[in-house]
Amino acid sequence: MYKIRPHISSALKIHRMLVPLAAVAVLIILIGARVWPGAQAQTAASISCETLASVSLPNTAITSAQKVAAGAFVPPGGRGGATAAPWTELPEFCRIAATTKMLNSDVKFEVWLPARGWNGDVQPAGSSFWGGAIPFARMRTLVNGGAATVGTNLGIEGFAGPSFVLEHPEKLENLKMDPLHAAIGHAKTLATRFYGSGPRFSVMDECGGGGSRDVMAEVQRWPADLDAAVAVNFTNYGTRHGISQVWMHQATHRSPAHFIPSEKLPAIHAAALDACDLRDGVKDGVIEDPSRCNFDPGVLLCKGADNNKCLTAPQVDAARRVYETPRHARTKEPIYGHMSPGSELDWASMIGRDEPYPYAQSFYRYLVYRDPNWTYAARPANFDGDVDLAEAPQNLVMNHTNPDLSGFVSRGGKLLLVGGWNDNLPVQNVITYYERVVAKVSADKVRNAVRLFVVPGMHHCFGETHPGSYKVDFDAVAAVRQWKTTGRAPEQIVVSTSGEGWPARRRLVCPYPQVSKYKGSGSTDDPANFTCRTP
């Protein structure tokens, strides 16, 4: 039987210090709402955009500073922009392009400043995991929201994924995120010159991939850069992230008999729900707390002919391994998080391929074996020597796992962490990091500075893939702004389902390690009928 237990002892200390539930307001700040304490007055430019071309920035050359008319911006092609059509909804803004010399690289970055209606924020745009392009698409969203923004290519351009490592291994140092740190400082300087006053709030709000990695790097290494930050489904353990993806692939590809076709995943999911859905008092197709779910896929062992409602013995073995914590074959050290009961409908992207997930392939090809011709079929990865190669000193710069957030906390910084139990990047990594922060910084200090919400049924970055998928229905930046300006932390959040033809549901989610519990009466789709309790 497999019972997944995250470490919760330190987090329980936080729960005991939480204010009484009756005194806590439920946070339900809808996307697009702009009503919160400390909301910023809108500001217009005080000088011309072109004037900024003459601003002196350390080790930096400003190559252009031009006003872009409303609706006229056409993004460059490629990953950062992805389209050649104009973004007609963009407001008028000042576009500054510049290059900074650092780390033996020409780091390109852009700063976008709304010409009117600036909300007082500087909100950096997160990078792709390997850099390579300025994140225009993310900057588009942020400027549309009224923020000044900055994005950088991290000094890595012209390469696919991490292939740059073969020719320029020194550029791995760029993934320590010094380029973003420098760009944020320059953005604040330019915003101050343009508007005649400095930014009132600096915040990042990113999900998955490189963006959430950037958030974690910022709060760990440069605590003065941001007043607040939001990291959703963050991937701060780059060296082990790829290893975990190979673990899932290998579990179901050790032989043709171990492969689990996607047609069988609904049966595994249904069996997991039968085992654990009712633990919170509500049968709603979602497991509230998978960490306390006793589920063995062996209950699905075929008793007769193989079919999509049962598993063969090798498939049972494969499913059990997917739920297991990946471990070093020799030292038995845990490597990464594991998949949770209830997540089965989201396995296909990891196990339904002939080769491992693309991130894992590129990671092993360029950072583990340094062989551009490597394929998994020709040389399957192992969990002994290959783990040691993955964690070679030169690769560790991409990890941002330091739990010592005392610098950020002591400045009054606020960090909101969100994970999804159904994420195919196992949420246990998020939980483990949070627990380490609590242990390092102290439960009392963390209570006032860091919150973790783990959302039942939530896929990666709020993705909704089936009727049991929940999304977070609130403005995270507004939440951390309110927290920063009033001291009121988000003690509860509300999630919902919204897929066409799906049952409309809204549920209460509590700060980890608390869980939502049905009070016993009233609609189970009304969050008012749930309360937060410690398991």
Walk through the language-model features, giving the residues of each.
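N-terminal secretory signal peptides that target proteins for export/translocation
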Residues: 1-14
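Catalytic-loop region of hydrolases
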Residues: 36-120, 134-137, 269, 282-287, ...
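Cap/lid segment of the alpha/beta-hydrolase catalytic domain
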Residues: 119, 128-196, 243-244, 251-254, ...
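Alpha/beta-hydrolase fold nucleophile elbow
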Residues: 197-208
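Glycine-rich nucleophile elbow surrounding the catalytic serine of serine-hydrolase chemistry
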Residues: 207-217
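A catalytic-pocket lid/entrance helix-loop region that shapes and gates access to the active site
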Residues: 217-219, 224-327, 454, 468-472
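Short beta-strand/loop motif that positions the catalytic acidic residue
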Residues: 417-419
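Conserved alpha/beta-hydrolase "acid-adjacent" motif
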Residues: 425-429
